């Protein structure tokens, strides 16, 4: 599977007609923000009267490697489901640019255009789509919401999805395993990200229990994150934890070299952080999460299921991704590092720094 990483300045529109499991009219193509058209993913044969046709809005909160990976996995799995169940599906992709106003505009449009289902990717996108769809029966199947309860996405009749909830204690144990006797850990995150709230609380609780001091720094933009990273370096921390925080993920390529130069190990809540230079990423398999999200969509559209029949899913946390060149630049022995990590993970993979998965 190929994953693409890009910083979008406009909404992304793609229509992909896929053979697949009556019919609804195609939604209008208007939007309150600029959009561009991407090539179709695949060409579908002519629709017969018996073929059901569904129109799905995929609303990505912003562009970065993790969310791109999820979106592509969703589309690939829905392609397979379409072929297996005999329905036809068209997609329209929207990008909210991590902007609440843009996401609200998208929400108003997709609800007005009466899509058969909406797939928001990440917490803010999900919250905006749920608000926009309030009072309608439009199915909303979110992907990668770290804490659905905190985000206010539970107990809503037309809403379900997948969660990338993080096992924070496991990551903190990785830090301690690689740094026996460590007495201070940095926490780098965006205060406005719901996806970070519980994980940061868990990290603080872990540190308090184990007699470890914490140094917290925050940022809401890439520039602020760079300053926060510099402040952590100035504070003398040797290890930093970041959860599944979209703001920090977007800035990772801008800060990883500073951490390397200062001898700081960055431990993070997703493999895409590691791809972008952080020493360690830990968490769920985002391809698996995207596939599970697509499966929920096909069950809702084709199998007569309702969101109430499909409670939100969580996944095993256990995959460690090590950026080999970062670990080596920090003077760490890769074999020894893997041995130290083994008790706290189910799998260890390696990557080298890049903008996107390939």
Per-region residue spans from a language model:
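Extracytoplasmic "Venus flytrap"
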Residues: 50-76, 81, 92-101, 192-196, ...
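An alpha-beta-alpha
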Residues: 56, 74, 164-210, 306, ...
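Beta-alpha junction/loop-to-helix N-cap segments that form part of ligand/metal-binding clefts
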Residues: 93-153, 245-260, 264-269
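Structural motif
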Residues: 88-112, 218-233
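Hinge/cleft segment of the Venus flytrap/periplasmic-binding protein
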Residues: 299-358
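Bacterial lipoprotein signal-peptidase II cleavage site
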Residues: 18-31
